[in-house]
A protein has these predicted regions:
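Soluble-to-membrane junctions at the N-terminal ends of transmembrane alpha-helices
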Residues: 1-12, 45-75, 217-250, 271, ...
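Juxtamembrane coupling segments of multi-pass membrane pumps/enzymes
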Residues: 92-152, 183, 309, 477, ...
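Membrane-water interface of transmembrane alpha-helices in multipass transporters/channels
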Residues: 26-37, 61-68, 82-93, 233, ...
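Conserved cytosolic catalytic loops of P-type ATPases
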Residues: 117-210, 313-356, 399-400
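Membrane-embedded alpha-helical bundles of multi-pass transporters
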Residues: 20-27, 50-59, 72-83, 301, ...
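Cytosolic catalytic headpiece
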Residues: 117, 312-534, 567-570
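Juxtamembrane helix-loop transition segments at the membrane interface in multi-pass membrane proteins
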Residues: 52-62, 103-117, 293-312, 620-626
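Transmembrane helix-loop-helix hairpins at the membrane interface
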Residues: 1-125, 227, 236, 243, ...
């Protein structure tokens, strides 16, 4: 870019000198041509070379070709009888063309910088423990199960589990969140994050190629391959448009003089001048550059907020969102169970929870984890539990504190012949029997995410007409969550195949021109994510399925970012449309003026380079989309 700035500056100085020489020195036309050829070739050699190479490679009709024939024509027109020289105009057109390209390069660089911060998350080395020594190796050379050491300030190279130490992680490059994430022994650690404080030893759970950082880099690098409808149209349009423009210019130059009353040679310079203006004005740079640049800026703006969109075609889709379907667990809720209520039956409440937590101490079921978390670990350790038996589809039976305790569902109570009581609360009901008598029940519920309600409200404000929740939970649970969040409808008790069927039904019912998005956690939702018009995966940090199956990946667990992605997409589409209509409007106006003789080469320069620069700056607004 520095070289181009120098070239433009030197050309501008030489052009001013040439204009002064022409004004104050009465020189023959051929000498003036030589003087003007110096700045012309200095600034235009690259364009002329590209045009020539395009001719030999079969890419005849491009902007370099248009600029070349227009400026060469302007240089030659002065040698025609009765025509005025247009040497300064020829150099000015080429100079401003290069200035326009300079602004384009700058804007494209800014747009790419907005995404390149994600490519910078790739780690260079991994510190691996081998034979009692720590050595630096390439992340690609680390196998699953090896121990790596991550020091403060270093980027985590590979996914794994912390086996020693505790620290805070900076996940801003992935999620857009400024708050650090605390981790300790037993926690998963994702590649691409920066270790902020303590030294941690990590046991790798994936090879580098399958780690989060590799998946994200692959996603970002391929994002510009999926073009939007607008981009695809502009690309096809330019292929047809440019040859048509050249033919129209030739027609304008040669046909009117044939029918002119003054004779062909007398009127040919006038119409040739108009044809050259026509060529300069018709250059499609503003459209070909600014529209893709708008979408690239939108992708960058979204990525900075932790929303990875796999291509600008999905920006198009998000802008037309009409129906949003949510999976419940892990999407609108945390997918972590907590004890909501304890209802004893002629039994002490504390004792009921105490015994249930003891019996579930060795269970791997999420309900067991919720019960253990609800009771202090030291109390659990102080009680002897024997003869633990986990009964599939029923619950757990064990001896605790000299009593036979059964913790499970209503089917377990029926098998024991124990009369149990139903509960008016929604959630998972865990019944407890002690020594063959009903002791009460515990209500365990999935916790709704803090910003789930705001996510639904945000989508409503943006005009999304229908919000739906699908869940495999009971009817009562689904109803409670749907009412709490203000969803339009819900469907409970669904198997994975049922969810696909529901999405297909909703797609058939959606309004024409609208898009249906399915939002899931990416763990067991791959079939539905693929079936929806747009698949949005929550919590991309650590979910391979999310990155593989979805079209849009939210790198954290905030469903409210869906509305943010929609806002960015709509703003991006709006900016692209502004550029299209502005460029077409100005060009058509000046083309009309040029055809009837009121256009000038300076107007043509503005219609081409000026419009391109303005469109590029407008496209850069997509980078700051909110």
């Amino acid at each position: 870019m520095k070289r181009k700035i120098t070239l433009i500056s030197v050309t501008a100085v030489l052009l001013v000198c040439a204009v002064c020489i022409e004004k104050f020195c009465q020189l023959p036309v051929w000498q003036l041509l030589i003087i003007y050829l110096v700045p012309y070739l200095l600034i235009g050699f690259g364009t002329l070379k590209e045009a020539a190479e395009g001719i030999f490679e079969g890419d005849l009709f491009n902007e370099d070709f248009l600029m070349s024939i227009a400026t060469i024509g302007a240089l030659c027109i002065g040698f025609l009888p009765g025509a005025e020289t247009e040497f300064p105009e020829a150099v000015f057109v080429m100079l401003f063309f290069q200035i326009g390209e300079l602004f384009e390069e700058y804007a494209e660089g800014k747009s790419r910088d907005s995404i390149s911060h994600l490519l910078a998350i790739r780690p260079d080395v991994a510190n691996v423990e081998r034979d009692g020594k720590v050595s630096e190796v390439s992340p690609e050379d680390v196998a699953i199960g090896e121990i790596i050491v991550v020091k403060p300030g270093e980027r985590v190279p590979i996914d794994g589990k912390v086996i020693e130490g505790e620290t805070s992680l900076d996940t801003a490059a992935l999620t857009g969140e400024s708050l650090p994430r605390d981790i300790s022994v037993g926690d998963s650690i994702m590649s691409g994050c920066i270790n902020l404080s303590g030294v941690v030893r990590v046991k790798t759970t994936k090879v580098f190629g399958e780690s989060t950082v590799s998946k994200i880099i692959d996603l970002v690098e391929s994002a510009d391959k999926n073009k939007s409808k607008s981009e695809s149209f502009i690309t096809k349009f330019a292929r047809v448009y440019t040859p048509v423009v050249v033919m129209a210019a030739l027609t304008l130059a040669f046909i009117p003089p044939v029918f002119a009353g003054a004779g062909f040679m007398a009127s040919f310079p006038i119409w040739l001048h108009r044809a050259l203006i026509f060529l300069v004005v018709s250059c499609p740079c503003a459209l070909v550059i600014s529209v893709p640049l708008s979408f690239f800026g939108g992708l960058g703006a979204a990525s900075r907020r932790g929303v990875l969109i796999k291509g600008s075609n999905y920006v198009d889709a998000l802008a037309n969102l009409g129906v949003v379907v949510f999976d419940k667990t892990g999407t609108l809720t945390y997918g972590k169970f907590e004890v909501e209520a304890v209802h004893p039956d002629d039994f002490d409440e504390h004792e009921l929870l105490h015994l249930a937590a003891h019996v579930e101490h060795f269970s791997t079921h999420p309900i067991g984890a919720a019960l253990r978390n609800a009771f202090p670990a030291e109390a659990v350790d102080g009680c002897e539990v024997t003869n633990v038996e986990e009964i599939a589809g029923r619950g757990v039976r064990a001896e605790a504190a000299g009593r036979t305790v059964c913790v499970g569902n209503s089917k377990m109570m029926d098998d024991l012949g124990v009369e149990w009581h139903d509960c008016h609360l929604a959630g998972t009901i865990v019944h407890v029997a002690v020594d063959g008598k009903y002791a009460g029940h515990i209500v365990i519920s999935d916790v709704v995410k803090k910003d789930s309600a705001e996510a639904v409200r945000g989508l409503k404000r943006l005009g999304v007409e229908r919000t739906v929740m699908l869940t495999g939970d009971r009817e009562a649970v689904g109803k409670e969550v749907a009412e709490k969040l203000g969803l339009d409808e819900y469907h409970a008790g669904l198997l994975p195949a049922d969810k696909v069927a529901q999405v297909e039904r909703l797609i058939s019912e959606k309004p024409a021109g609208k898009v249906l998005a399915f939002v899931g956690d990416g763990i067991n939702d791959a079939p539905v994510l693929k079936r929806a018009d747009v698949g949005i995966a929550m919590g991309g940090l650590g979910s391979d399925a999310a990155i593989e199956a979805a079209d849009v990946v939210l790198m954290d667990d905030k469903p409210s970012k869906i509305a943010e992605a929609v806002r960015i997409s709509r703003r991006t589409i709006g900016i692209a449309r502004q550029n299209v209509w502005f460029a077409i409007g100005v060009k058509v106006s000046i083309l009309a003026l040029a055809t009837v003789g009121f256009g000038t080469m300076w107007m043509a320069v503005f219609a081409d380079v000026g419009v391109t620069v303005l469109a590029v700056f407008n496209a850069m607004r997509a980078l700051s989309a909110r």
